Each structure stands twice: as C-alpha cells, then as structure tokens.
Amino acid sequence: MSTNIDILSKMKKLLLLISAVLLSTQLLTAQDVTGTGTRQWTMQQCIDYAMENNITLQKSKLQKESATEDLKGAKAALLPTFSASTNQSLGYQPWKDTGISTVTNGQVNTKVDRTYYNGSYSLSGQWTVWNGNRNINTIKLDKLAEQSAELQTQETANTIQERIAQIYTQILYLAENVKVNEEMLVTSKKNEERGQEMLNVGKMSKADLAQLSAQRANDEYNIVEAQSQLMNYKLQLKQLLELTDEEEFDVVIPDFSDDRILEAIPSLQSVYEQALLSRPEVERSQLAIKSSDVSVSIAKAGWLPSISLTGGVTTSTNSLSGTNWGTQMKSNVNTQLGVGVSVPIYDGRSTKTQVNKAKIQQLQAQLDLQDLQKTLYTDIQQFWLNAWTNQQKYLAATSSVESARQSYDLLSEQFRLGLKNIVELMAGKDNLLSTQQNQLQSKYLTIYNQQMLKFYQSGEIK
C-alpha cells in the first residue's frame, strides 16, 4: 500500500510539472500572437530578421565576397604562370615520287608517303620577379578594399537598424494616437447623446445638436486617418523586413515608464568620442586614406624598371623523318631560359599624371574624413538636442494633459447641467486632444532620440 501511495504522489508531481511547462509555453507564445492569431514583433525581432533577410544587406555582403576574390587574384599574381600547347597538322604531296626504301629478302621496296603529319609541343613559364612592388602594393590595396567592403556591409546594417527604429517608434506613436482618438470618439458620442436628450426637453437647439454630431463625425474621421497612417507604417516595416506574405503584422507595444523616458541623457562629447571609435563609416573613411597612400605607391612604380624570367621547352615530330615518334620527341627537344628587363624612359607623362591624380585622391580622402567627422558630430548633436528638448516638452505636456483633462471634466459636467455652451465644451475637448497628442509626440521623440544616442555610443539599439 505504501508503494502505491508513493507512485501516486510521484505521478501527481509529474503532472504538475507538465502543466507548469505547458503554461509557460503558452505565456511565451502569447508574446508573439494576439488574440486574433496575429504575430507581434518586438523591435529586436524586427532587427534580427532584417539582418538575415533584407535584400539590400545581402547584396552588400556579395560585394565583400567579390573583394575577397580580388584579393585572392592579387596574391596569385605573385606566382609564376605556366602554359602548355600543342599543334598538329596533316599534309599531302600529290606529285611526290621519292620515299623510304627498305630491303626485304634481297629485294628493295620503296614506299612513297604522300600524306604526312607534323606535331609540335611546348611548355612555357613566366614569372615577374620585380615590378616596382606593384604586385605587393596591389595586394595591400585589395586587402584594404576587402576591409572596406566589410565595413560597407556594417554601414548598410546600421542604416537598416536606424530605419527600423524610426518606423517602429512611429508605429508605437500612431498606435497610441489611435487609442486617444477612440477615447475622444467615445466622449463625442456621449456628448451627442446628451445633446439629443437636451433637445428632447427643449434645452438645446437643432443647430447646437448638429455641431455635436459634426464633432462626432470628425472624430470618426480622425480615427480612420490615424489608422490609415498606422497601417502605412506597418507596411513600410514589412517591406523593410522583406515580408511578402499576407499574414497580419503587428508590433509589441512596450510600457515606457516615466523613469525610462526621463532617464539621464549621455553627454554629447562622450557619444561623439565613442562613435569615432566604433562607427564603421569612420573606419571606412580612414581606410580610404590608407588606400590612397598605397595608390600613390602603385602609380610611382611606373617610373621603376621591371624584371621577369621566362623559360620554355619545345619539341616536334614529323612522319617523314624516318625515325619513330619517341626518338623524335627526345632528339628535337629545345629549351630556353631568359631574363627580361624593362626600363621606362618616356611614357608621354602617363605615369606622372597617374601619380598626381593619386595624390589628389589622397587629399580628397583626407577631406572626406574631416567632412564625415563633422557630419557625425552634427547628427549626434541633433539627436542630443532633440532628446533633451522633447524630455522637457514631455514634462510640460504631462502637466498640461492633467490640467486639460480636469478642465474638460468640469466643462462636461457644467454642460450637462446647462451651465456651459457647446462652443466652450468643444474648445475644451480640442484642447485636451491637442495636449494628449503633444504628450505622445514628445514621449516617442524622446525615446527615439535616446535610442539613437545609445546606438551611436554602443552600436546597439535597445
């Protein structure tokens, strides 16, 4: 009996464990699926998916692979090249009257071959021993190009992430804006119903009721407009993620606390200093300067001599020679080995032009880096200013919303009692809507600009 009780106890524990696992699975799944079966995406999920599927990013990765192939080709150019060739020809001499004579059993036999063939065979090689370090510098240049292509891919990835953050934040704003307008519509309907009651008892004119009805209709239009904007930005996000299916698409709307919105903004200088060290566009611009230095060296190689080695082995056969093929192949072998030296004397100023243009490109690359650093500082400065300004606006708007709501609640009660007219009621309602929208706008602009500052500082969007 004791054993049976122990078994039952263990089974109950096992069932409880299974139930807990199933419940946890349902809770995890609920993050991705709404009550209607629509998957909800977090911003990080959008970014991760785009990094794997965005076509523009994939094309950028191919550029890096192409640069890698160029580098392999440049390295292979240091090695000697070899080639083999053969030429076979068939000839015919219709009026030939002499041939090869042989003696068999005391008799002389003469064989006249009017058809014959020739064969030639060769193996040759060439090696550039020195060409003013052009090959070595080409390898350096292609290495820099490969690194630059990799950084270009990172730039593309950053651009996509920034765009996702921008669209995602706009979706969050518009989603809340829809809710605000829906709340306004509920209020408008109540006012319209109250107006109808007042009309029935003779306390309101039809003209005043028409204004309330017009306000309700306008609020319905505002909802449609807000929903349309929301759908448009969701579509833009789907396109950025390369989602082409007809599945419903939605995003997770996080709950941003006031502490999150009003958190300390990192200093402008600290963000800029970190961005100079980590942003791929800065590193790529620095590589462009190094590349221009190497390009100058490559151009100057046009003034230097080049040395090359050549060698070859040739042989030939002829069916009329009277000896067998193997003997001919051996006896007709000819080998060659040569050293070539090319010294440039005058090239019509071609090399000087290339050197000067490479130096101009060198200066251009240096100016491009300075311009990029200036643009980077300006962008970060704008993000910082927007974050700080909208934080202050959010504080002011939050206070204004509370005051406007209290004022409108009072106006609504006074209107219900007949102490306020329609104009005052509608003005109060419009003021409340305006302050709520200002609060939402400053809230999400603060969040977006904070995200961008963190992204430029750490390379991650959170």
Q: Predicted regions span which residues?
A:
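Positively charged n-region of N-terminal signal peptides that target proteins for export
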Residues: 2-14
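Sec-dependent N-terminal signal peptides
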Residues: 14-23
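Bacterial Sec-pathway N-terminal export signals of envelope proteins
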Residues: 22, 30-87, 93-94, 245, ...
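Small/polar, glycine/serine/threonine/aspartate-rich low-complexity segments that form flexible
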Residues: 32-39, 85-127, 254-264, 297, ...
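Periplasmic alpha-helical coiled-coil/stalk elements that build and connect Gram-negative outer-membrane
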Residues: 41, 69, 159-274, 386, ...
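Sec/SRP-type N-terminal targeting helices
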Residues: 58-62, 75-76, 115, 129-157, ...
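Short segments within alpha-helical structural elements
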Residues: 76, 218-243, 401-459
